[in-house]
Amino acid sequence: MLDIRWIRENADALVLALRKRGQEEAAARSTVEEAIAADEARRTHLTKLQEAQEQRNAASKEIGKALAAGDKEKAERLKAEVAELKGFIQDGEAQERALDNRLRDLLARIPNIPLDDVPVGADENDNVEIRRVGEARQPNWAKEHFEIGEALGLMDFERAAKLSGARFTVLTGTLARLERALGQFMLDLHTTEHGYTEVQPPLLVRDEALFGTGQLPKFDEDLFRTTDGRWMIPTAEVPLTNLVREEILDGEKLPLRYTALTPCFRSEAGSAGRDTRGMLRQHQFYKVELVSITDAESALAEHERMTACAEEVLKRLGLPFRTVVLCTGDMGFGAQKTYDIEVWLPGQKTYREISSCSVCGDFQARRMNARYRAAGDKQARFVHTLNGSGVAVGRALIAVMENYQNEDGSISIPEILQPYMGGLKKIEARG
């Protein structure tokens, strides 16, 4: 959420930022003007309400003086005035809450402002590659992951559909174990070498948590909601970031770095017809998440560090990848800047996203009221938040299957994962 004071003072800059994100000039200006008008109405109302409260307080004091002077008529007149003001104030306080909610809702729907070095563009075609690691091999016999998995008898989409419908997968045997091994390897790397603290968070959260990280109110159609009103997490970013909601942290203890391996649940409402075969786009999938809570001065360096931590996963696995910086039109709602890491899939003959690492500034912190106090400071400041995939486990499984497939249909297990697989070096049909 953006600071309304900043919006008032930088209206044209916000319009420009919204245009960079793909909004038309008229829509962008309407968004900004509506927020400023709502704030003006709220401030005007607050002034009137404060004046009424001052009048009530002054009249209440005069009642005592009138009674002391024996002027009962004046005292009764003042009592009537106080009663009238009391009713006005009660109505005014209700209106104040409505105006607060109106402004909050408008601000909650305005996306974050891209940093100056983010490339301006419309969509993924305008993203800019910044580095490429590893050789993208393309054997002429390469198959896609679902062909490999079904041929091995370890990946079952038909039974998954019978159980749950489209966009689900049943993994069995050594392929299920390989996915588990990937998640364990990632957690071990991030906790023992990268300094992240492992967390096992709830998978069901309240509205406030999703508001804090920016999924609500704008993107509710992308989520699954339970009958009791809780939401299934679309990413562990939600519970991990909200650990500091409504807290004032000790600045000396920043940065806080959290990681979690959780299932994630997404409706994929806007993905009809995309990646309908295989595991690339599922309603349920595992992901290792990285979250950092830091101060403004350290946030950009932390962003580079987090991205390097995610890249290290792919380096250790021996998977070719490239890292791109997203353009303004392709960035997420709450991000100031995002790096996507895309892994090479020889079966698809292309790179596909496996991690997205974003710096959000104080955008989420304002929604969560998450602050810190630096040593010697009386004033608490908003923290800066970052999040990234470290990495998507299901997509890592796909990448291992396609990059380590053999011409006979077997899958060689990356050396780094063999200890997690009981020393197994290859997955074959009998697995």
Swiss-Prot record:
- Name the top EC class: ligase
What are the recorded Gene Ontology BP terms? selenocysteine biosynthetic process; seryl-tRNA aminoacylation
Catalysed reaction per UniProt?
A: tRNA(Ser) + L-serine + ATP = L-seryl-tRNA(Ser) + AMP + diphosphate + H(+); tRNA(Sec) + L-serine + ATP = L-seryl-tRNA(Sec) + AMP + diphosphate + H(+)
Q: What is known of its domains?
A: Consists of two distinct domains, a catalytic core and a N-terminal extension that is involved in tRNA binding.
- How does this polypeptide assemble, per the annotation? Homodimer. The tRNA molecule binds across the dimer.
Entry protein name: Serine--tRNA ligase
The task this protein performs is described as: Catalyzes the attachment of serine to tRNA(Ser). Is also able to aminoacylate tRNA(Sec) with serine, to form the misacylated tRNA L-seryl-tRNA(Sec), which will be further converted into selenocysteinyl-tRNA(Sec).
InterPro entries referenced in this protein's UniProt entry, alphabetically: aa-tRNA-synt_IIb (IPR002314), aa-tRNA-synth_II (IPR006195), aa-tRNA-synth_II/BPL/LPL (IPR045864), Ser-tRNA-ligase_type_1 (IPR002317), Ser-tRNA-synth_1_N (IPR015866), SerRS_1_N_sf (IPR042103), SerRS_core (IPR033729), tRNA-bd_arm (IPR010978)
Q: Which UniProt keywords apply?
A: Aminoacyl-tRNA synthetase, ATP-binding, Cytoplasm, Ligase, Nucleotide-binding, Protein biosynthesis
Summarize where ATP binds, as residue positions.
266-268, 353-356
**What species is given as this protein's source?**
Chelativorans sp. (strain BNC1)
- Residues of the signal peptide: none
Member of which family? Belongs to the class-II aminoacyl-tRNA synthetase family. Type-1 seryl-tRNA synthetase subfamily.
Give the source's domain of life in one word.
Answer: Bacteria
GO MF annotation: an example: serine-tRNA ligase activity
Spell out the NCBIfam families in the cross-references: serS
- EC number(s): the record gives 6.1.1.11
Q: Name one GO cellular component term.
A: cytoplasm
Q: Where in the cell is it found?
A: Cytoplasm
**Organism lineage:** Bacteria, Pseudomonadati, Pseudomonadota, Alphaproteobacteria, Hyphomicrobiales
Listed binding positions for L-serine are: 235-237, 289, 389
Biological pathway: Aminoacyl-tRNA biosynthesis; selenocysteinyl-tRNA(Sec) biosynthesis; L-seryl-tRNA(Sec) from L-serine and tRNA(Sec): step 1/1
Q: Name one Pfam family in it.
A: Seryl_tRNA_N
